[in-house]
Every structure is written in structure tokens, then in C-alpha cells.
Amino acid sequence: ADMAKVSQEAAEKAGLTMADIEWIGVGTPGVANSATGVIEYSNNLGFNNTPMVKYLETALGKPTFIENDANAAAYGEYVAGAAKGAKNAVCITLGTGVGAGIVIDGKIYSGSNFGGAEVGHTVISVDGPQCTCGRKGCFEVYSSATGLVRMTKEALAANPESAMKDEERISARTAFNYMRAGDATAKQVVDDYIKYLAAGITNTINI
């Protein structure tokens, strides 16, 4: 998608014109170099050394800043959300991938290469499914919404008697919905998902 066009459409949906906007903030998955304005690598979005700040400032004429999306979420929680008042905090985000943001003494921890909290690519199982990063068995492979959909489809293929067979489109909610209705296959999917999620959270705490 054209990020400048998407930004303009978002402003219009909010009832704003670009004249109403002082600056633009971009939260992106992957390694975002906030010093240079370059998205160095984002495996899920296909960005590779993309000069996002330069592009948006040229296209929209507004000061623009980038940050890893999980870092931005973590700082938001630290300032005004669940972590308000804490000295240090970790926020794990679950979506297309798995991300994390770490705040230490009020500052985002970026690491030496702006990838200091890429916990989604810590390995849960060395012989696990392939991750988009190139490794196998990453936390993200099991605990993202994408991973949950994959596990649900695999369980359904192995257990075609499951009531989930009637679902037209498998989503991240499917296994949870059918588990509540008493489906044994769905319950196993959810149990496995929680097991992997717990392992990933525990690893993050131990870092």
C-alpha cells in the first residue's frame, strides 16, 4: 500500500485535513531505525532498508518519526496505560506476528541495532515450523494470530470430524469460539496455543 495515501485516508476518516496535523508518527513491525528514519527490515511487511521518514516527509510535507510498533505500544502503556507508574515495563503484542517493547527507567530499550526486543524470533522449538525470518520454531510461529490460524487448520485436517469443519473461514477466533461450544479439537488447539504463549512470555521475563 502507498503509505502517504493511507495516511491521507486515515486523516479523512478522522474528519481531519493534512493542515490539521502537525506531525506523523509511524509504528512498524521489525527493525525501525528511529535515528535515520529507515525501516531496516520488516519480514511481515516486506520492507528492507526503506527510507520511510524521507518518503513521507517529501510526500506529505510533515515532520515524521518512526518507531517499532511494539516499542510505541509499550511506551503508550508506560505513559498512560497498564504500566503507568511502573519503573520498568515489557509489553508483548500479538497480531500478524509477535512483538515486544521494553521500557527501562522511562526510556525505550532499542538495543545496539534497534532490534533489542524482537522476542517474537526467540526460538521455542528448534524443529518447529518455518518462520518468515528464516529460523524454525520461533515464538511468533506459535503465538501470533497467523500461527494460531495455521495450528487450527492443521488440527482440523487431522480431525475432520471437528465441528470447525463447518466454518467457512478459519480465523484466530475460530478455535476459541468452538472450544467454548465444547469441541475437543478446538480445545486442544487452544491448550497448545496457551502452552507456547506461556513459554514465550516466560522466556521474555527471563531475559
Label the predicted regions.
Residues 40, 109-110:
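Generic structural signal for well-ordered beta-strand positions
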Residues 66-70:
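Short loop/edge segments at beta-strand edges and connector loops
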Residues 115-118:
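Structural signature of FAD isoalloxazine-binding scaffolds in flavoprotein oxidoreductases
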Residues 48-49:
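Short catalytic helix/loop segments, enriched in acidic residues and glycine
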Residues 25-29, 91-97, 101-103:
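Short beta-strand segments
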Residues 30-34, 72-74, 99:
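Short, active-site-adjacent cap segments at secondary-structure transitions
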Residues 1-23, 33-36, 53-64, 76-87, ...:
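ATP-binding/phosphotransfer module of carbohydrate and carboxylate kinases, centering on a glycine-rich
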